[in-house]
A protein has these predicted regions:
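Short intrinsically disordered terminal tails
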Residues: 1, 167-169
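Conserved active-site-adjacent core of cysteine acyl-enzyme catalytic domains
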Residues: 43-167
Length: 169
């Protein structure tokens, strides 16, 4: 694989093409890299020229919890996006149904085995398509997606709305 390999948006952190790569000091993308996958999907949706190899090389030591074994720190997600020119706003869970429209969202949900990041990319019809969520990418309203997580014993604990940087003409 080289820097020009294009995976597009990623829907599985366990994909054999990249899942066993190190993440943090002791983790792997497959086991603990959902935060990195969410970041990649947001950045890739904003700029289709982004490729996984250079993205991974630049972020493989992003701040993690417990040396990578407990995934990505939420503050690292926000900091990384803001450093790249993205506008990031916290969305109150109780107000998600009426939240303003963003180019993308990142959901942090708690479930039986720990926490999990899921990126949603805005569609033209007013929904988001959610990636790396243990099933096929699904277009849904944000509030419906959060309810679907609750219905499967996952509990949304944080949601961020993301606006993509303005491209120079």
């Amino acid at each position: 694989m080289n820097e020009t390999t294009d995976f597009g948006l990623l829907n599985s952190q366990t994909d054999e093409r990249y899942g066993e790569r190190p993440y943090g000091h002791f983790g792997t993308i497959a086991k603990n890299g959902c935060g990195m996958i969410a970041l990649y999907n947001i950045e890739r949706a904003a700029d289709e020229t982004i490729r996984f190899e250079p993205f991974y090389a630049a972020r493989k030591q992003i701040k993690t919890n417990f040396f990578g074994l407990l995934g990505t720190r939420p503050s690292s997600i926000v900091k990384n996006l803001r450093e790249k020119g993205f506008e990031v706003q916290k969305i109150r869970l109780k107000k998600a149904e009426h939240a303003e429209r963003y180019d993308g969202v990142i959901v942090l949900a708690w479930y039986f085995f720990g926490a999990h990041y899921i990126a949603g990319i805005a569609n033209s019809e007013g929904t988001y398509t959610f990636y790396n969520q243990f099933r096929r990418p699904t277009p849904m309203q944000l509030s419906a997606f959060l309810q679907s997580l609750k219905n499967t014993k996952q509990h949304p604990i944080r949601v961020w709305g993301v606006r993509f940087p303005q491209k120079a003409n």
